[in-house]
Amino acid sequence: MEPVHYSVQGNNILQIFMENFHKEDPVLFLDGTAGEGGHSLLFLKGFPNSKVILCDRDPVMLSRALARLVDFKERVVSIQTNFSEIDSNLLSSHGINDSPQGILLDLGISTFHLFHSGRGFSFKEAEPLDMRLTPNIGINAEDVINTYSKDRLMHIFYTYGEERWSKKIAEVIVERRKQNLISYTSELADLISKIIPRKLWPPGRHPATRIFQALRIEVNQELTHIEKGLDSLLNLLRPEGVIQVISFHSLEDRIVKNSLRNYAKQNGFELLTKKPILPSEEETKENPASRSAKLRVLRKTKSADKKYKKENSKEE
């Protein structure tokens, strides 16, 4: 089973951990978004005495990651869970009584999900409108498209997709589904491409891209999980530990940026990236999908005296 996902900013991430930990240290890493295990493989090779807690909400991805890391199975503990649910009680139930020193969250959708899962994340194939990252649990994209009100559809298209044609697209979907349910990615993509005039299509991008992003975020409640997960993981992180987070679009990055900056102000944390680290030109040539990846890093300098209290940040 060959991996199909590229480990975005892998060299940068490993280098940052190398700068904060000694190579021979028995570092405990937590990969909160395991994917196909590419980043964890770098940690296991780069730190020969380390262990990795491998987490993913998708059992298919977790299985693929474990297969890739089979040579290191004695140093890997796997947990099927959303990273937002990770806390000391969950780790303890899996025999882990220490807090992680290195945490990684890669918030991007994997290549496997887009092109090989058959769950309708991409409009390039005629697939069922599903989009669930945890299979068979919760509402799917077909439910959203065929049951949400016009106003609710318009809201998620505009809020999560930043789509200026949100109102018109929502209106057409509601009228169209009165005749037949919209069940396949190709149906939805074709419908959207007919609504937006071709001369106004975004350069180099299918006009349905923003709507598909909005649906995926809604189905999986991605932004809610990011907020909750950062709060939990930053409190779980061991003193002198480091958390690295990769975001791919402005909605994700805004949450990550503000959360990390607020922690750095209040709770004995040090922001190691005043500005996000971007992929190298070489990496973007090899993997064009990485071009929008922003890496932000925070180090815990001491234990927080009390649980973090959110405050809104208006800093850029």
Curated annotation (Swiss-Prot):
Binding of S-adenosyl-L-methionine, residues: G37, G38, H39, D56, F83, D106, H113
GO BP terms: rRNA base methylation
Biased composition (Basic and acidic residues): 302-316
GO CC field: cytoplasm
SUPFAM superfamilies the UniProt entry points to: Putative methyltransferase TM0872, insert domain, S-adenosyl-L-methionine-dependent methyltransferases
EC number: 2.1.1.199
Enzyme class: transferase
Family annotation (PANTHER family): 12S RRNA N4-METHYLCYTIDINE METHYLTRANSFERASE (PTHR11265:SF0), S-ADENOSYL-METHYLTRANSFERASE MRAW (PTHR11265)
Purpose of the protein: Specifically methylates the N4 position of cytidine in position 1402 (C1402) of 16S rRNA.
Record-given protein name: Ribosomal RNA small subunit methyltransferase H
Organism name: Leptospira borgpetersenii serovar Hardjo-bovis (strain JB197)
